[in-house]
Every structure is written in C-alpha cells, then in structure tokens.
C-alpha cells in the first residue's frame, strides 16, 4: 500500500508526507458551497439538461445551423455546430461577440462553433444565444 494513501499511518504519526494543495482545497470548498446554493447536484443536472435541450432543439429545426455530434453522442456541456460555410461561421462568431456571446469559435482544425454551457452558464445565457442564432439565420 502506498504510504501517501495510508491515512491511518499518517494519523498515527500526526504528520503528512506532503503539504496538501491548500488553494485547491479552498476553491473546492467554494465550489461545493456554490453547488449547494444552486440546489445541489440534482438541480444542476436538471438545469444542464434544460440548457442542452434548448440549444439542440433549435439546432434540430434550423435550416442554417447543423449540430456536428450524432444525437446519441451529444454533450450537455459543449454543443458543436456549423453553418456549412467557413466564412459564414466566422461572421457568426464575430457578430455574436458584438452581442456579448463570446468564445464561440470552434476548434482551430475542425472549425465551426462550440457553445460551452457548463454549470455556471445560466439558462438565460443559452436562451440569448438561441435568440441570436434565430436572428442571424433570418438575416443570412
């Protein structure tokens, strides 16, 4: 058994083999408190399902934007999509940024767009993105 993981021996010796990552522990504590304040893990899961559904439902009906992941492989956190035209993708990213919708540019090799809708992203943020996508589609 690895000495670092033998907590009984460490406790008996009233010592540690290394100094714990204090800042990491502090940040983890803040994160756990935030999760609790949001209603817990189950509430975050429900919200993440709602956000992903909102965006994927729009992508599934859009005539301009197409999701790049197969339905069975879709991520709740990173939603990737394209217009099918690299110049139009670039225009979308630029105009979205002007509306405060930032960091939507996709991977430098794959291209397209990627909306990262992690836990801290509110449903309202995803709705703002979908509303902008609808407007962009109408205008293009």
Q: What is each of the regions a protein language model found here?
A:
Residues 34, 58-62, 91-100, 132-139:
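Generic non-transmembrane alpha-helical segments
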Residues 64-68, 100-106:
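A short linear hydrophobic-aromatic micro-motif
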Residues 18-21, 82, 119:
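Hydrophobic alpha-helical scaffolding
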Residues 28, 35-36, 80-82, 117:
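Short, well-ordered beta-strand elements within core beta-sheets of diverse protein domains
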Residues 98, 110-140:
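PLP-dependent enzyme catalytic core of the Aspartate aminotransferase-like
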Residues 12, 75-79, 111-113:
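Short amphipathic alpha-helical segments
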Residues 1-56, 70, 139-140:
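Active-site C-terminal subdomain of aminotransferase-like
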Residues 65-96:
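Conserved PLP-binding catalytic core of the aspartate aminotransferase-like
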């Amino acid at each position: 058994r690895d000495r670092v993981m033998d907590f009984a021996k460490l406790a008996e010796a009233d010592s540690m083999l290394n100094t714990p990552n204090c800042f990491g522990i502090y940040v983890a504590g803040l994160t756990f408190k935030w999760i609790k304040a949001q209603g817990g893990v189950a509430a975050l899961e429900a919200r993440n399902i709602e956000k992903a559904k909102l965006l994927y439902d729009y992508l599934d009906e859009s005539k301009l934007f197409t999701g790049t992941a197969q339905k069975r492989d879709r991520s709740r956190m990173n939603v990737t999509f394209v217009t099918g035209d690299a110049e139009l993708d670039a225009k979308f990213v630029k105009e979205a940024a002007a509306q405060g919708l930032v960091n939507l540019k996709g991977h430098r090799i794959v291209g397209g767009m990627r909306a990262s809708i992690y836990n801290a992203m509110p449903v309202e943020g995803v709705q703002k993105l979908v509303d902008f996508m609808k407007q962009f589609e109408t205008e293009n």
